[in-house]
C-alpha cells in the first residue's frame, strides 16, 4: 500500500489527478516492461513469461487514469510497435542495465524510436533497470552506450515551453526492489498534458 500511496501522492502533487494518458512501455525482451506494469498495477512481483502479444492495462491511481501498452520486446513483437504510436502521450523505454552485451541492440531500437516523426514531440522516460544486480551499468555508462550523454533535458522541473525540445531523461531503477522508477514517473508526469 505504501507504493500506491507514494506514487499517488507524487502524481497528485503535480496536478495529474484528473489527467488521462496513453503510455507505451517499450524496450528489448527481458528488460522488465511487464514486471513494471504489474508492479504499478498490483504492487506485486510475479514471474512472467516473455510477452508474446501486445497487452494493455488501465491503471487508476486515485483519479489518474493511464492506459499502458506493453508491446513485448522480442524481434517479432518490435514490428508492431509503430501500430501504437497514434495519440501516444509518453514512451517508457526500459533497458536491462545488467545485459551490457545488448546495449548496441537497445541503442538501435531507441534511435529508431527517437527518429520516428510520429514520436517527434513525445516525452521519453528511459529506465535503466536491474541496478540491484552486481556489475550492472551505471547511469553514466548507460547514457554513453545509448548515445545520450549530451541529449537529455535534465531531471528536475525543466520548462521547455515552445522550444521544440523533446523531453528525454534517463533514470536508473530496480523494479524488483521498488526503487528509482517513481522518480522517473514523477519527471515524466510534468510533460503529460
UniProtKB/Swiss-Prot annotation:
Sites where the protein binds Mg(2+): 29, 70
Subcellular compartments: Endoplasmic reticulum membrane; Golgi apparatus, Golgi stack membrane
InterPro entries documented for this protein: P-loop_NTPase, Small_GTP-bd, Small_GTPase_ARF/SAR, Small_GTPase_SAR1
Binding sites annotated in the UniProt record for GTP: 30, 32-35, 129-130, 132, 175
Region (Mediates recruitment to ER membranes): 10-14
Binding positions (GDP): 30-35, 53, 129-130, 132, 175
Broadest EC class assigned to this enzyme: hydrolase
Protein's recorded name: Small COPII coat GTPase SAR1B
Gene label: SAR1B
Amino acid at each position: 500500500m505504501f507504493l500506491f500511496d507514494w506514487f499517488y501522492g507524487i502524481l497528485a502533487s503535480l496536478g495529474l489527478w484528473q489527467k488521462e494518458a496513453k503510455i507505451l512501455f517499450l524496450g528489448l525482451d527481458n528488460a522488465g516492461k511487464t514486471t513494471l506494469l504489474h508492479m504499478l498495477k498490483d504492487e506485486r512481483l510475479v514471474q512472467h513469461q516473455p510477452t508474446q502479444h501486445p497487452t494493455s492495462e488501465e491503471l487508476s491511481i486515485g483519479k489518474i487514469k493511464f492506459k499502458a501498452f506493453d508491446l513485448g520486446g522480442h524481434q517479432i513483437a518490435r514490428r508492431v510497435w509503430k501500430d501504437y504510436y497514434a495519440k501516444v502521450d509518453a514512451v517508457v523505454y526500459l533497458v536491462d542495465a545488467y545485459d551490457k552485451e545488448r546495449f548496441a541492440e537497445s541503442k538501435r531500437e531507441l534511435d529508431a524510436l527517437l527518429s520516428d516523426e510520429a514520436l517527434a514531440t513525445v516525452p521519453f522516460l528511459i529506465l535503466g533497470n536491474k541496478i540491484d544486480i552486481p556489475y550492472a551499468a551505471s547511469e553514466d555508462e548507460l547514457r554513453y552506450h545509448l548515445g545520450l550523454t549530451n541529449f537529455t533535458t535534465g531531471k528536475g522541473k525543466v520548462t521547455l515551453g515552445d522550444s521544440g525540445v523533446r523531453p528525454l531523461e534517463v533514470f536508473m531503477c530496480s523494479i524488483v526492489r521498488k526503487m528509482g522508477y517513481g522518480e522517473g514517473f514523477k519527471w515524466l508526469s510534468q510533460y503529460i498534458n
